[in-house]
Amino acid sequence: MSTAEQRMDTSEVELPNDNVNEQGNKTPRADQPESSASGARNHGEDEEVTEQVELAAMETEASDSIVDNVPKTPRRAGRPKKLPSTSTAAAESAVTPGKRGRKRKGSESVNTTINSTMNSTLNEPKTPGRKQAKLVAPLLTYDLFAPSIIGDRVLSCGEGEALGHPGRTTTKKPRKVDIFEEEGLKPLQAVAGGVHSAVLTSEGEVYMCGINEKGTVPAEGVEKEGSTDEFAKVKFEEDIEKEGKIVMLAAGASFTAALTDQGSVIAWGNLRNSNGNVDVHPLLHKMQEAPVVIVHQAKRKIVKIAAGENHLVMLDEKGCLLTFGDGEMGQLGRSSRTKTIRSKYMCDESGDHLLVPLRFKHKGKFFDVVAKNVFASGFWTIVHGEDGKYYAFGLNNYAQLGIKVDEADVGQDGQDNRELRVFLPAEAPAFGAERTFVNIEGVQHVVILGSDGKVFAMGKNTDNALGLGNWTGKDDQQHWLYDTIQEIEFDSKIVGVSAKLATSIAWSEDGTAYAWGFDTTGQLGLGLKDEDEKMVSKPEEISSAHLDGYSIIGASISDQHTLIIAKKN
C-alpha cells in the first residue's frame, strides 16, 4: 500500500460505531470516504451554466455545518423571466415615439430619467454625517508569517535520497548535511515533502534533493525523472527572479511552492489525486517542466502559503483566502462537486477564481469573515478568522478538523453512510474562539501550537499519535480517537511543531526537540533500532552528536524523513 493510500485508509482499526471517549463523547468509526463525488456530469454548455449558478449560490448560502452527502445538483433550466415592476411598466407605457428615426425604447427613457435624477442628486450639497464610516482591516504582511531566525546547520534523519547525504540513504538520528556548511550557506527554512526536501537560505536561494518525479526537484544537474541524494541549487529563470526574493516555502507530496517578498507565488512539481496526476490545466503541465508563477503580485499580493498533500492554500494582504490544486477531498472549500471542478477554478494567475467565500449565516443574517491566518496539511484546510473563530474544510474522517462527524447517517443496515468530507467552510467548534493557534499540522491527527507555547492534539490516536500515552491497543475503544483538543504536557515552552502521518515533532524555546508517534523509517530521530518498539507513546527528547553545541530552531517532518535547522550556541 502506498503512503498516499495509507493517509486516506481507515481500515486498520475495526471498532464499534458507538465508542465513547474520556469526555463522554461518542466517537465515530472512521471509514474511508469514497473518492467519487455525486456522479459525473455531461460536459458542455449546460454544465458551464450549472457551475456558474452553483458558485454564485455558494456565496449566498450558510456554510456552518458538515455537508452530509455529496449533493446531486439538478440541472437548472435558467432563471424564470422577471416580470416588470409596476413603476417600470408605467414608465414604458408613457414613452412617446420620436417623430423621425427608430422608436425609442422604454428602457432608454427610464435610463435618461435615472441619469438626470442622479446628476441632480450629485450636485446637491451633502448633508454632514449622512455617510457611515467603513471599517477597513489593516493589511497583512508576509513578515508576520515568514521565518526570520537564520540557522547555521541543516540536519536530517529517516530514509531515502531526500536526506541529502550522498551515498547514505538511512540515518536513525539527525545527521548534519555537509554542503551547507562547506559552502557557507545559511539556512532559513527547511520543508520535507513526500519524496523530496527543500531548504531556503537567507539569500533567498532554494536547494533541493530527492526524487525528480515530474519536475519535483528541478535543481541543477538533476536528470528529468531522475533523482539525487545531494542538495543542489534550483536555478530560476529571469522572469521568475523578477517576482522578488523568496521568503517562504511550502511542500506537498511531490510539489513545492515559494512566496516572494513582492507577494507572488511560484510552484513546481506535480499534483495527484486518486486517479493519478492532476493535469487538467496548462499551468499544471508547465509546473512539471519548470517553476512557474501561479499567482502574480500585480494581480494579488499573497502574504502566506501552506501546503497539503496535493493542494496549496494562500492568504492575501486583505485577509482573502485562496486555494489551488486538487479538491477531491473538499480541501479547496469552493464546491461540493469535487469530480467536475473546471480547470479555471483550480488554477488562475489572477487568483479571482481561487477565492474561497467565507460567508456564513447567523440569526437570519449573512456575514463575511476576514481571515487572519491559514493552515493546511494532509487533505484539509483550516482558517482563523478575524472574529476569533476557526473554520475548516476537507477530509474529516477522524474528526481531526474540530468538527464532529454526524452519527445520524449510520443506516439501519449497519452501513456507514456518513459523509466524512467537509466541502465548504464550516465552523470548527473544537478549536473554540478563546485561544490563538500559530500552527496546525497533521494528516489523520493534528498537532496544534498555541501562541502561549502550549501544545494540543486531536483526531486519530492509534499508535499514540496524539502523544498522550493512553492508547493500549486495538481493543482500546475509549482512547483511539478524540474529537476535542487534548493538551500534551511539556516541561518548557514550545515554539514550533510539525506533524504528518502518525508522527509528530515539537521544539522548545531552549532549542530542544521532542518526537512521538510511530517511527517507521527513523524519521523521529530517536535512534530506534530494528528490534526496538517503534511506537513512541509520549514525547521523547531528540539527541545526536551532530547537535552538540547547537539549538534547534526549526523542523519539518514527513512520511519517511525529517529536516532540522539548528543554530550554534
Curated annotation (Swiss-Prot):
Cellular component per GO, a single term: cytoplasm
UniProt feature, compositional bias: Polar residues: 108-124
Biased composition (Basic and acidic residues): 1-10
One Pfam match: WD40_RLD
Keyword vocabulary terms for this entry: Cell cycle, Cell division, Guanine-nucleotide releasing factor, Mitosis, Nucleus, Repeat
GO molecular function terms attached to this record: guanyl-nucleotide exchange factor activity
Swiss-Prot/TrEMBL RCC1 repeat ranges: 263-318, 388-452, 511-568
Coiled-coil residues: none
Subcellular location: Nucleus
Described function: Key component of the Ran GTPase system, which comprises ran-1, ran-2 and ran-3 and is essential in nucleocytoplasmic transport. Promotes the exchange of Ran-bound GDP by GTP and regulates the onset of chromosome condensation in the S phase. Binds to the chromatin. RCC1 (ran-3)/RAN (ran-1) complex (together with other proteins) acts as a component of a signal transmission pathway that detects unreplicated DNA.
Protein name, as recorded: Regulator of chromosome condensation
Species this chain originates from: Caenorhabditis elegans
